[in-house]
Amino acid sequence: MPTQRKIETVADLKQRLERMQVAVVADYRGLSVADMTDLRKKLRESGAEFVVAKNTLTRIAARETGHEAIEPLLEGPTALAFAYDDVPKFVRAINEFNRGPKKITVRGGLLGTTLLKENVLDVVATLPTKDEVRAQVLGGLAAPVTGLAGIIAAPVNDIVNLLDATSKSILYALQARVDQLQPSSTS
């Protein structure tokens, strides 16, 4: 008979699996509590979560949510990291943590219901984050607007230059005529 705690754990894992865009399965052996806390903090900053779960309970949750593809990765001590929003930022947070003295061993993951090999996550880490994509899109949108402003301003500048040149020409012509009409002082 399953205990209430196990039922709640399965329900929690199901909810996370249903919400996630990417899940990473890792071996956390060798990490201290402080290391795990540091990793959780880094992942939380990227909008992700890191949980340690029993393989049996994870299998049950995976089967009930249609994520059976994760089952081959559930061997030995298992930790799961769930990304809900900005996947490249999430993978970069894991890679950044793994550059330190303590590392987690990434076994693979899920993208939706598709099994990912460990090396695919390295490719995902090279993708731009949401903020970077937004900046690129805004930059792309701003460039034509800036060009349009230049095109619109050009005729106005040309008119101003023409009027300036015309007024100077008229001024010089008037000055020349005034000089002609004035009696010369040598006469």
UniProtKB/Swiss-Prot annotation:
Give an example GO biological process.
translation
Give the record's GO CC terms.
large ribosomal subunit
Query: Any idea which UniProt keywords this protein has?
Result: Ribonucleoprotein, Ribosomal protein, RNA-binding, rRNA-binding
Keyword Ribonucleoprotein present in the record's keywords: the answer is yes
Query: Where are the coiled-coil regions?
Result: none
**Record's InterPro entries?**
Ribosomal_uL10, Ribosomal_uL10-like_sf, Ribosomal_uL10_bac, Ribosomal_uL10_bac_type, Ribosomal_uL10_CS_bac
In this record, what's one Pfam family?
Ribosomal_L10
Q: Under the GO molecular function aspect, what terms does this record hold?
A: large ribosomal subunit rRNA binding; structural constituent of ribosome
The UniProt entry's sequence similarity note says:
Belongs to the universal ribosomal protein uL10 family.
The job of this chain, per UniProt, is described as: Forms part of the ribosomal stalk, playing a central role in the interaction of the ribosome with GTP-bound translation factors.
Q: What assembly does the database describe for this protein? A: Part of the ribosomal stalk of the 50S ribosomal subunit. The N-terminus interacts with L11 and the large rRNA to form the base of the stalk. The C-terminus forms an elongated spine to which L12 dimers bind in a sequential fashion forming a multimeric L10(L12)X complex.
What is the protein name given in its UniProt record? Large ribosomal subunit protein uL10
